[in-house]
A protein has these predicted regions:
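Active-site phosphate-binding strand-loop segment of PLP-dependent enzymes
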Residues: 1-64
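Short amphipathic alpha-helical/adjacent loop interface patches that line ligand
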Residues: 34, 41, 121, 151, ...
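Short Gly/Ser/Thr- and charged-rich N-terminal loops/segments
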Residues: 67-69
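Amphipathic alpha-helix from the class-I
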Residues: 111-116, 130-152, 162-169
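Conserved glycine-rich beta-strand-loop-beta hairpin in the small C-terminal domain of fold type I
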Residues: 137, 154-162, 173-180
Length: 180
């Protein structure tokens, strides 16, 4: 939460990493909490690296944002006023489009950040093969209804696990609100 983040800031702090929905807990950071975190980051001139790989897989109905106007998605700190220019959003096609193993991901960030990360990426690996790139474009540009179907399947599986563990007296269950 914002208070914990602010308490942990030192003169060496340059960025905060947010993972929402979080894996493996399924915790989703609310839009209100993201706004509080954004204020802390703006006050201390700190960047945010936001891992949003699981953003379309939320199970609560309280998140308000949508994917293509349809299903609820986890809120993004990049949408908070004043945060677009200090946020690096990390995304992947692996989860949303069931393309695990294809190793296709992307960043949403200010142009200067993209230029610098491109230099680093060139030195770390070659490029994603062309077939995977075309498949990624097709996944992003194509129909998104399968994402909702996958989310419903995950929701049903989550419920099976919750029901199975509900009677265990030694466990205190926290119902996951999102993730894979």
């Amino acid at each position: 939460n914002a208070a914990d983040i602010e308490a942990a800031i030192t003169p060496r702090t340059r960025a905060v990493i947010i993972n929402s929905p979080g894996n493996p807990t399924g915790a989703v950071t609310s839009a209100a909490e993201l706004a509080r975190i954004a204020e802390v980051c703006k006050q201390h001139n700190i960047w945010v690296i936001s891992d949003e790989v699981y953003h379309p897989f939320v199970f609560g109905e309280t998140f308000g944002e949508t994917l293509g106007g349809e299903a609820a998605v986890a809120p993004s700190i990049a949408a908070v006023p004043g945060m677009k220019d200090r946020t690096i959003v990390v995304e992947s096609l692996s989860k949303t489009y069931a393309m695990t193993g294809w190793r296709i991901g992307y960043l949403l960030a200010p142009e200067a950040v993209i230029e610098q990360t491109g230099k680093i990426a060139e030195l770390m690996h070659s490029s994603v093969n062309s077939l995977a790139q075309y498949a990624g474009v097709a996944a992003l540009a194509g129909p998104q209804d399968h994402v909702a179907a996958m989310r419903e399947e995950y929701r049903a599986k989550r419920q099976i696990v919750l029901d199975g563990l509900a009677g265990c007296p030694v466990l205190r269950l926290i119902e996951p609100q999102g993730a894979f």
